[in-house]
Amino acid sequence: MTPRAIFDRARLAQLHGRELASFRAARPRSAALAERARAHMPGGVPMSWMVKWPGEFPVFVEHAEGAHFTCVDGIDHIDLCLGDTGAMMGHSPAPTVESVTAQLSRGITTMLPTEDAIAVSNGLFERFGLPYWQFTLTATDANRHAIRYARHLTGRSKIVVHDYCYHGSVDETFATLDGDGRTTNRRNSIGPPVDTSETTRVVEFNDVEGLEKALSEGDVAAILVEPALTNIGIVLPDEGYNEAVRELATKHGVMLINDETHTICAGPGGITRRDNLHPDFLVIGKSIGGGVPCGTFGFTQEVADRITRSVELEDIDVGGIGGTLAGNGLSMAAMKATLEQVMTQEAFDHMIPLADAWADGVQAGIDAVGAPWHVTRLGARAEYNFSPEPSRNGQEAHDADDFELQQYLHLYALNRGILLTPFHNMALMSPATTRADVDAHTAMFDECLRELFSQP
């Protein structure tokens, strides 16, 4: 059974119209700013994704702190999106703000190292177990650099990714499987430089046999994975799947890149440390700087030795790795404070039980109306999906999507002061999130479903 079979679509449209009217009425200042913004920004936003929020215009933020933000219309919001993980440790955590503020007066960027870089790289080694680290401004760039090194070291060109993966704006990852199981450009991918079938081989998540086949041709440089899919809903690995990926990578001489940018929600060392995984490279960004643009990639001793032997000093600045602002003093100050004082085990001991409570509340609301939906959990992150059973791969998760329904549920929440990520039904807990915040969502969600599934 699908959601379309158990409630009236006409009623959904009617309720959605009501919520749109309420949204407009409550936010005149955001509406006015959106109109002004359209003069010189397409869609009235500084970054195109911001048009995907469920209202007719984005909510403009006046102030964000902890797990709440206030919009320009004076409405307080519980933030369960948290900048889609960028603010997973809360908005403007005090240690990060203090460190960044001090660094601003000492110099923002010099293209020379600061002492903070030593502390950050040491801390990342202790956290993830990889001994060497380099820094970027985004996880996207960290992924790009890891892929380039993998190609350089293996002499191979292709990469393998999971169907419906997400690794930032890395060109090679905007690929999916067509109906015949062949790699093709992802729908609505904007301006791909080449057909992704030339650069990429796509396999389904949790498909060990498919991965073995993809690697068997001997032309794959790297497997780029999230240890659990997070951007098509949460898709958890089967028992032993990540270990099988490692074994197959080793067997076929392929570099394994674990992208923990979202899955860091599993704990201070992400799924990699929690499950004792052993990638050749590990990538992380977003949350490690407390909201300041940061990214990093770590690698093994073997990889470091091979890079040292094969990269020439004379051309190191034109080899496609690095960037003028990467490793700047401000980013390093932000990462040092965030990693040492904010992204701690104690923080996750607070966050993960709250995510469990959120998931329990959502599941209770689903069960109360008999909806064939389920909730999936991953550390401090949880998500509800419009299918009766958890998805085992990206295609199953994609097939369970319902954009109209999602937009309504998100708008209903937003009108009651609760923000979810706009891309799917994900909630993220921060160290500043409280049980009262979770309970407010539980009550709102229950009310929303009872109205949607009742007869008018």
Where do the model's predicted regions map?
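Conserved N-terminal phosphate-binding loop of PLP-dependent enzymes in the Aspartate aminotransferase
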Residues: 1-456
